[in-house]
Amino acid sequence: MSEVLDNGQSRILVADDDPAILRLVKAIVEKEGYTVITARDGKEAYKVLQSGEPFAAAIFDVVMPYIQGTELVRYMQSEKRLMRIPVIMMTAEQNSRLSSDSFAAGAVAFLPKPFTNAQLQTMLRMFIRQS
């Protein structure tokens, strides 16, 4: 599937502090043919983003230790090399403000937990093709 990308990127950064969700998302994304780089919290994700490695997309939990997902998106929007990377936000929190905050920060999609494999696969296909 990575051949749909203009720049050949096939890596996706996934950050979530719940190990079970991290494993699930990694498995779904790998099934789509991507290489997954995982981060267990916002600080780890921030370090990965600073490394300069290219990514086709990012998937962040909204609520994480150290640095929230929305703060990561704001950081990405402030960096020229990161601002075009589509970010999908996800959360189990039942708070409509979190979705509006995610979109205001620059996320392209918001995925409430629990979600189905098909929902995440559809979002990946939709937003990576557009990037």
Task: Give the label of every model feature segment.
Residues 108:
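Short, glycine/charged-rich "phosphate-handling" switch motifs in NTP-dependent
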Residues 113:
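A Lys-centered signature of the CheY-like receiver
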